[in-house]
UniProtKB/Swiss-Prot annotation:
Protein name in the entry: L-lactate dehydrogenase
Record: residues binding NAD(+): D34, V35, V36, E37, G38, V39, N121
Family affiliation: Belongs to the LDH/MDH superfamily. LDH family.
Pathway(s) it belongs to: Fermentation; pyruvate fermentation to lactate; (S)-lactate from pyruvate: step 1/1
Species of provenance: Botryococcus braunii (Green alga)
Subunit organization: Homotetramer.
HAMAP family for the chain: Malate_dehydrog_3
């Protein structure tokens, strides 16, 4: 059987961590792409020299040529400018939209059969633009945010309830619309634990607020960059679900065609990821409060797309 091929577009902190994780897990050969000459080559060489020590034999290549991503089974896109302290995701829109155009065209021309995972921010707008520029089917282009948000939410809930993180399942969409009925501790919904007196709604609301600002909290602490370990781990989880046909339910920014009453937008929802990409959007029952919060998120995404179309008329 031919070895699988990963193309990682963007050789920054997330891209480098993705390459290391993919090699350690034996997921296949890796192309690390970046427009800056020397950076992907240097990181690829450094990572390759880990192989004899860590026991992997992945072929890791650094490249500045999109032709080298040809035949990739999975492409994970992290290219773009990272947030700096005081910078909002919306500030990134104009810069990263141009990056998505170049990346989308590179994928279209060299790896049109790949499953594409976008991590670049602002996520909901960038994954939409990437699909538009690449022309790939909507089920083969997805955004990574919900897995990361769920990981952060689960970590904070585990701290609150004093349990193992493995005992917590966080289920909620991108742009942070937590659905507490589907977030459980050892199988018990968080909403019921609040009713039982194990925590308070005020405390859980604080956790939700901290999760919403989870990326910004790390940016403020690092001062010179943004999170990369957890985002990379989340991207690999999505890639594995596709490559191994796991039919795994994961929260992701997926293209909606009427689900949740939303059409032609990328919004964070639970989806089934398997060998056909996004195989199904899981429509869970939402409370009136969750529906209202989801609509706020949808309206924010729509505003970003209007801005995108104003920047690049080909998207209109």
């Amino acid at each position: 059987m031919a070895r699988k091929k990963y193309a990682l577009i963007g050789a920054g902190n997330i891209g480098g961590t993705l390459a290391h994780l993919a090699a350690l897990k034996g997921l296949g050969d890796i192309v690390l792409f970046d427009v800056v000459e020397g950076v992907p080559q240097g990181k690829a060489l450094d990572l390759s020299q880990c192989g004899p020590v860590e026991g992997f034999d992945a072929n890791i290549k650094g490249s500045n040529d999109y032709a080298d991503i040809a035949g990739a089974d999975v492409i994970i896109v992290t290219a773009g400018v990272a947030r700096k302290p005081g910078m909002s995701r919306d500030d990134l829109l104009g810069i990263n939209l141009k990056v998505m155009k170049a990346v989308g065209e590179g994928i279209r021309d060299n790896a049109p059969d790949a499953f594409v995972i976008c991590i670049t921010n602002p996520l909901d707008a960038m994954v939409w633009a990437l699909r538009e520029f690449s022309g790939l089917p909507a089920n083969k282009v997805v955004g990574m945010a919900g897995v990361l948000d769920s990981g952060r939410f689960s970590h904070f809930l585990a701290e609150e309830f004093g349990v193992s993180v493995n005992s917590v399942l966080g289920g909620h969409g991108d742009n942070m619309v937590p659905v507490l009925e589907y977030s459980t501790v050892s199988g018990i919904p968080v909403s019921e634990l609040i009713e039982m007196g194990f925590s308070t709604k005020e405390k859980v609301d604080e956790i939700i607020k901290r999760t919403r600002g989870g990326g910004g909290e790390i940016v403020a602490l690092l001062k010179t960059g943004s999170a990369y370990y957890a985002p990379a781990t989340s991207g690999i989880a999505m890639a594995e679900a596709y490559l191994y046909d796991q039919k795994r339910i994961l929260p992701a920014a997926a293209h909606l065609s009427g689900e949740y009453g939303i059409d032609n937008l990328y919004v964070g929802v639970p989806v089934v990821i398997g060998a056909n990409g996004v195989e199904k959007v899981v429509e869970v029952k939402l409370s009136d409060e969750a529906k209202a919060n989801l609509q706020v998120s949808v309206d924010a995404v729509k505003e970003l797309l209007v801005a995108c179309k104003g920047i690049d008329e080909s998207l209109a």
